[in-house]
Regions:
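Generic structural signal for small/hydrophobic residues in well-ordered secondary structure
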Residues: 13-16, 23, 44, 60, ...
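Alpha-helical transmembrane segments
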Residues: 22, 29-58
Length: 226
């Protein structure tokens, strides 16, 4: 019986070739687009899913009277710290970072990279795990740097690089060696390391180095992500 169904279907296809082809192409296109849309929606739903207490994580966004005063995704540098101090029962933790682009070098290899200068709470706040290093002390030293697994391999060709150094240039042109104190497992998709399509930070430095880069965390700085 099933064989007869196939024969009938094939007869109809060959008898009405153009319309059959049109229907098949239309159906195939619809199925493909359905899968593509489903894949896109699923991918978007996975953003931040792996963060600690993801449902209780919030970005501070700003609405400036003067649009040129700052960005919607940034706010005044001390704000989240002040909120934690003034409302300890409401704000359990915070993480602020300033994104910059700088030149990194290792031997004769030179790289232009986005850096994230932030609070030492990065790992405890979001639950990112280190494959090498101590999460409790990774950002204690002023010249400490934490790299993702991807960047460790890019710069050194391996991941077990604790104690190794990489040179980072400031905006004034001075160069300083930073010691690798942690190697981060490549994080699942999130809006902390990849806040925009143009921003994908994989090099993390303690905010103790703000002066080296000519940055600050005072009320005059409206370009801090919190």
């Amino acid at each position: 019986m099933l064989k007869n169904y196939f024969k009938t279907a094939w007869r109809n296809i060959t008898k009405r070739g153009f319309y059959s082809l049109l229907n098949i192409v239309g159906l195939s296109t619809g199925i493909v687009f359905t899968f593509l849309i489903g894949a896109y929606v699923w991918n978007e739903l996975q953003v931040n899913k792996k963060l600690n207490n993801a449902k209780n994580q919030f970005f501070l966004k700003s609405e400036w009277k003067n649009p040129n005063q700052g960005l919607e995704i940034t706010t005044l540098a001390p704000l989240s710290k002040r909120l934690k101090e003034d409302y300890p029962n409401l704000v359990a933790n915070y993480y602020r970072w300033d994104g910059i682009t700088s030149t990194l070098s290792k031997g004769d290899k030179v790289f232009r990279e986005g850096l994230q200068i932030g609070d030492s709470t990065l790992l405890s706040m979001y639950g990112f795990s280190l494959m090498h290093g101590n999460a409790a002390t990774a950002f204690e030293a002023p010249n400490a740097v934490v790299l993702t697994k991807e960047r460790a391999i890019k710069y050194f060709g391996r991941t077990n690089i604790l104690g190794e150094t990489i040179t980072i240039e400031s905006f004034s042109g001075t160069k300083q060696d930073f010691q690798v104190t942690g190697v981060l497992n490549n994080p699942a998709r999130n809006s902390i390391t990849h806040i925009t399509d143009d921003n994908n930070n994989q090099v993390y430095i303690s905010n103790k180095n703000l002066d080296y880069f000519g940055r600050n965390m005072d009320w005059n700085n409206p370009y801090i992500v919190s």
